[in-house]
A protein has these predicted regions:
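Double-stranded beta-helix
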Residues: 5-8, 111-170, 262-282
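A short, N-terminal "cap"/entry segment at the start of jelly-roll beta-barrel domains
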Residues: 1-50, 137-201
Length: 282
């Protein structure tokens, strides 16, 4: 039997670039739960950011040692592949495509499947993070789910006539581009929110060629993942050099609470960057 061991928890105390090539690698799971490859960018006292992956046809479920129920808010943003995610306690199933996200809250059992021919890669924001006892330690306090269901027969005979009532009972929300809550920060930076709770605000920022943001500061920790383009990050209050950083696709960046920063796009290509802030955005 493979015993559960906590994943690595890289943490930083100043603005820090997180190159993809330098991320901590971890293999989660066992024969019963399935195995998941993790690329761990940061796991601070406030936020946890990883990319996890499944091969085509791969999946994760749960076992006695590896239980998939947490005491946190989570975003699973699909970078590549097709994710089918289920709540096996109720039978709820959602299909999530690249550029879409699944959002769920604490005490949600979940299983995930790569339902396509491409590798599945998913960006995860998790808060409160494992350092606060919200992952494996929390899961072991919950009764083990003995039976898994992947159909919700409560909706039969009622769909789509009672769609609103059925969706009201669902525990996993799929967030697509048309569902983003848009903000125009200081009239300069376009930000679309995937979620905003008392624990986690996550979203994507868009920066056209030649544009820059204003000065941004958050009371919570902030982590980034670059999905498109080349992004420069300026940290004017960082006391020691360097304070000017260049990010490429798949790179991350960490900003401790209160770290003021600016985003610059010096190229002729658009920038898209995903972010999480925890616990407080502003």
């Amino acid at each position: 039997m493979t015993q559960y061991k906590p994943s690595p928890r890289p943490n930083y105390h100043e603005p820090t670039p997180l190159p993809y090539a330098s991320t901590a690698r971890h293999l989660w799971g066992d024969a019963e739960a399935g195995q998941v490859a993790d690329w761990i960018y940061v796991s601070s006292a406030q936020i946890h950011q990883i990319v996890w992956g499944l091969a085509p046809g791969g999946s994760f479920r749960h076992s006695a040692e590896f239980r998939t129920i947490f005491g946190a808010d989570l975003i699973y943003y699909v970078l590549s592949g097709t994710m089918v995610i289920a709540n096996p306690e109720h039978g709820e199933v959602q299909r999530v495509l690249p550029g879409e996200a699944a959002f769920f809250r604490r005490d949600t059992w979940h299983h995930a499947f790569n339902y396509g021919t491409d590798p599945l890669r998913v960006l995860e924001f998790f808060a409160p993070p494992p350092s606060q006892g919200t992952s494996g330690a929390y899961a072991r306090t919950k009764p083990l789910l003995a039976h898994s269901r992947y159909t919700d027969d409560r909706a039969l005979g009622r769909w789509p006539m009672e769609r609103a009532a059925i969706e009201q009972t669902q525990t996993i929300t799929v967030v697509r581009d048309q569902d983003l809550l848009w903000r125009f920060e200081d009239g300069q930076l376009l930000v679309g929110l995937l979620c905003s709770t008392e624990h986690l605000t996550a979203g994507k920022l868009l920066l056209p060629p030649g544009h820059r943001s204003g000065r941004l500061c958050h009371p919570g920790d902030k982590s980034l993942y670059l999905t498109q383009g080349t992004l420069h990050v300026f940290c004017p209050d960082k006391p020691d050099a360097p304070n000017w950083f260049e990010l490429h696709e798949q790179d991350g960046f960490f900003l401790p609470a209160g770290s003021c920063h600016e985003f610059h796009n010096l190229t002729g290509q658009p920038v898209e960057c995903l972010f999480g802030v925890a616990p407080t955005y502003c």
